[in-house]
Amino acid sequence: PGGGVSGALSSLVQSLVR
C-alpha cells in the first residue's frame, strides 16, 4: 500500500468524528 492507507485512515477518522 502507500496511498490507499490515506483513504483507509480517512474512513476511520470519519467514523470517529461521526
Curated annotation (Swiss-Prot):
Annotated source species: Nautilus macromphalus
Domain of life of the organism encoding this protein: Eukaryota
Q: In which tissues is it expressed?
A: Nacreous layer of shell.
The protein's name is Uncharacterized protein IMPP16
Task: Give the lineage.
Answer: Eukaryota, Metazoa, Spiralia, Lophotrochozoa, Mollusca
